[in-house]
A protein has these predicted regions:
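NTP-dependent nucleotidyl-transfer catalytic core
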Residues: 1-177
Length: 177
């Protein structure tokens, strides 16, 4: 750690930790590389089609997705229609929600000529990766996942085993893109 970083760390009222400063330094370096050569980067993001998007979605992530797309970053957006059934009682509105999600993305500035948008259900090969991936993790590991644990606690009702596969499905998403 440099003297300047140490002074920043110990300055009165400064609550940043050394690990935060190191992470910020790495983030700043990555951002500089992104600005210089955006085409060397790939962004993978997505949403579950559970309803219409709102301002929170826009300011929380979609605005930045549009900016990254317009910088020239290879942009992939998953519409995680299979993941909706992990914690929902019905699949009745999924098709309408997928269509509305795409329309909302486009209205917010996502350009389908610059960004690949796809649903899980449209890519059988991605879902076929799920079985061999599941053979690499134990049931106990799936139950220890903090996101899965909080979803189970928050649901208030019994959930299907599909929720346990959610993080493994996300690993398949990453390999696909």
């Amino acid at each position: 750690m440099t003297d300047q970083e140490q002074q920043q760390l110990t300055a009165a009222g400064n609550e940043m930790s050394a690990s935060f400063l190191a992470a910020k330094k790495r983030s700043d370096a990555t951002l500089a590389k992104l600005e210089a050569e955006p085409g060397k980067f790939t962004m993978l993001t997505g949403d579950r089609p559970t309803g219409r998007l709102h301002l929170g979605h826009y300011f929380g992530s979609i605005k930045e997705r549009v900016a990254m797309q317009n910088r020239g970053v290879n942009t992939n957006i998953i519409i995680a229609d299979y993941q909706v059934i992990t914690d929902r009682d019905t699949t009745e509105h999924i098709q309408d929600n997928v269509l509305n999600l795409v329309l909302d993305y486009m209205a917010a500035g996502i350009d389908p000529t610059k960004t690949m948008m796809f649903t899980h259900s449209a890519v059988p090969a991605e879902n076929q990766l799920l079985l061999p991936f599941l053979s690499l993790v134990t049931e106990a590991e799936l139950h220890r996942n903090p996101t899965v644990k909080s979803e189970m606690e928050a649901s208030g009702h019994a959930l299907t085993g599909l929720l346990l596969t959610y993080p493994v499905h996300q690993a398949c998403d990453i390999l696909f893109c």
